A protein has these predicted regions:
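Intrinsically disordered, low-complexity, compositionally biased regions/tails
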Residues: 17-18, 49
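Residues within mature, well-folded domains
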Residues: 25-171
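Residue-level marker of intrinsically disordered, low-complexity segments enriched
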Residues: 15-17, 125
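Bacterial N-terminal signal peptides that target proteins for export
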Residues: 2-15
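C-terminal motif of bacterial Sec signal peptides marking the signal peptidase cleavage site
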Residues: 20-23
Length: 171
């Protein structure tokens, strides 16, 4: 009886800790629209990538690639005020890419530098690949295939081999 109570208490304690941790916000989530961009750099450090936006603003990015699955992106207006902050390596963000319309520049500005680039000569396609978490559960790779003019012609998602339990001890 005593061991049963102890196991139940430990399980309940572990569940409470897990619940509390899920409520923890990421540092960028507490930055409201309209805040000065310096608030972000104070919390996250200087951005590793900066891109110009069509309206004259900037997109600041803090990637965790090549081994991470997250890139925090902040859109900042010309006066240096935050418009929005979000995690861009996400299936809903990837699905915004328009086949036949988006270019390499569009992909770069929206998702940052890829974790991997390759070229398939028989397809005549350059491929940019990004790591991400799908539904915060599955480790995935999302790839953009570009034609010779740099236009997105195909996208593809696949499981991330880095997290494949059958391939962990290859070497």
């Amino acid at each position: 009886m005593r061991n049963t109570f102890r196991c139940l208490r430990n399980a309940l304690g572990g569940a409470c800790v897990a619940l509390l941790l899920t409520g923890c916000a990421q540092p960028w989530q507490a930055v409201p629209p309209g805040a000065d961009a310096s608030v972000l750099t104070a919390r996250l450090g200087p951005p590793r990538e900066v891109y110009d936006l069509p309206d004259g603003g900037k997109r600041l990015m803090w990637p965790t690639q090549p081994l991470g699955e997250f890139t925090t992106a902040a859109d900042v207006d010309v006066s240096g005020k935050v418009i929005n902050v979000r995690q861009v390596l996400d299936e809903n963000e990837f699905y915004k890419a328009q086949i036949g319309v988006w270019t390499k520049k569009d992909v770069l500005v929206n998702f940052g530098r890829p974790v991997e680039t390759s070229y398939f000569p028989l397809m005549k396609r350059e491929v940019w690949t990004y790591r991400y978490m799908e539904a915060n559960i599955w480790y995935m790779m999302y790839s953009f295939y570009f034609d010779d003019q740099g236009i997105v012609r195909l996208t593809q998602k696949t499981p991330d081999p880095l997290h494949d339990p059958d391939r962990r001890n290859v070497f």
